[in-house]
Amino acid sequence: LQLHAVGDLAELDRATGSGGALEAAVRAQQEGLVAAVGITGHGSQAPATHLEALRRFPFATVMTPVNQKLLEDEGFRGDYERLVEEVRRQDAGLMTIKAVARRNWPHVGAGESASGQAYATWYEPYDEQERIRAAVSWVLAHPEITGLATAGDVRLLGMIVRAERERMPLEDAATALQTDADYASPFLRMPA
């Protein structure tokens, strides 16, 4: 069971506070309804928030956003590296989201819905096989990562699975992604 959408400290406080989602998840685990409890979150604060979450509770898994563009940001990278250290110390699983996120949808402003776009995602995903292959290869080349969540549109699933089977070296993946002038953090504008 993953506590979802815990991407900042206010959300973490709600989830881990009295009467929060964590209490229900732990109860479900104690009753044998779930084997493990993890945490997931979106946004540029997610790695720092998930580090704090691991200080509060021994989550079995952490699912945090990671891709090449996100790790280019020095602050994000530092938070991510500290999270990786703690995940290793606690022997938790580290999974990623946003591996194939290309950028925000063009013409969708902060707080606006992304409905009507080509895919059922709130960000624009890569949708060309070679770009997906590069993005998946780049993420999975990091040994701390135990898995990735696919983009939220089933039409991309086959390309993501194929990308995993046909991975390219990290250097080639990085070069392929760097050639996309529109590659950007999907967290520049968050949807409603």
Can you say where each PLM-predicted feature lies in the sequence?
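Beta/alpha (TIM)-barrel catalytic core signal, keyed to glycine-rich beta->alpha loops juxtaposed to Asp/Glu
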Residues: 3-192
